[in-house]
Amino acid sequence: MSMLAERRRKQKWAVDPQNTAWSNDDSKFGQRMLEKMGWSKGKGLGAQEQGATDHIKVQVKNNHLGLGATINNEDNWIAHQDDFNQLLAELNTCHGQETTDSSDKKEKKSFSLEEKSKISKNRVHYMKFTKGKDLSSRSKTDLDCIFGKRQSKKTPEGDASPSTPEENETTTTSAFTIQEYFAKRMAALKNKPQVPVPGSDISETQVERKRGKKRNKEATGKDVESYLQPKAKRHTEGKPERAEAQERVAKKKSAPAEEQLRGPCWDQSSKASAQDAGDHVQPPEGRDFTLKPKKRRGKKKLQKPVEIAEDATLEETLVKKKKKKDSK
């Protein structure tokens, strides 16, 4: 099977992948030759018959590890490094490369990269740059942690004495539950006298300023609303007497205009129809109904002189016709 990250590949499956037909065949040339030399089934190969008795089986390897390595071996890389170092030490002792002098008697000359950079003529000394690369200032435990070396000497467990309790220590046990304890503490905190904080006066003044700002905003909002209302409503809300006087003046102005429009042909029937129309159109209860005076347009004013001029021309034509008849 191909993994998700791998490319596709075709696989051919044989009828007998383990090759059991060959292993079970006793008439093989190699097996007959070994049996003549004294070998029999169940014995291993070799002079002392210490070889493998089973057939070699093919195993699929899908990782990049070495032969015989498993994933669990990766976790023990520090132990592998220790084993490798021990092997190198044994090889050195066998070949005589290790000196007999102990490390305690040796006086190792420490090489400080930081001091060398200070002494050098060139401008190389940068504090963080040199200090980070200088390992002479590091301790042995730090180096072991960096390079992954395990400590060979283990601290004896028996030497560690258990911590003895002090003689002056006192332990108190209470019968209260956790909820009762915290309720008691909260009651004690509430009963404590509250000390006035000097910053509280400042906070109160700030709150008062904010309240004053809110009031000013509300007042300005009301002024804007009253300004946006129509003028007739504003007058009527505050002064009802003045509104009534304005209605009377409007009625007086509309009366002569209605008489002019009626003319001499106005009958009682038209008055009755007007009264009927007035009866039909009644204001709803609880509301004032004011008749707005009708505004006359400029075109209507021009209509009257035109009609008068037409009447004059008709009279002139009639007079001329009468004169002609009389002359004849």
Curated annotation (Swiss-Prot):
Q: Which Pfam families match?
A: G-patch
Q: Which residues carry this modification: Phosphoserine?
A: 270, 273
- Give the record's GO CC terms: chromosome, telomeric region; kinetochore; mitochondrion; nuclear chromosome; nucleolus; nucleoplasm; spindle
Annotated PROSITE patterns = G_PATCH (PS50174)
For this UniProt record, give its keywords in alphabetical order, as a comma-separated list.
Answer: Centromere, Chromosome, Kinetochore, Nucleus, Phosphoprotein, Telomere, Tumor suppressor
GO terms (molecular function) for this protein are: protein-containing complex binding; telomerase inhibitor activity; telomerase RNA binding
**Record's comment describing the protein's domains:** The TID (telomerase inhibiting domain) domain is sufficient to bind TERT and inhibit its activity. The TBM domain mediates interaction with TERF1.
Q: What is this protein called?
A: PIN2/TERF1-interacting telomerase inhibitor 1
Q: What species was this sequence derived from?
A: Homo sapiens
Q: Which gene encodes it?
A: PINX1
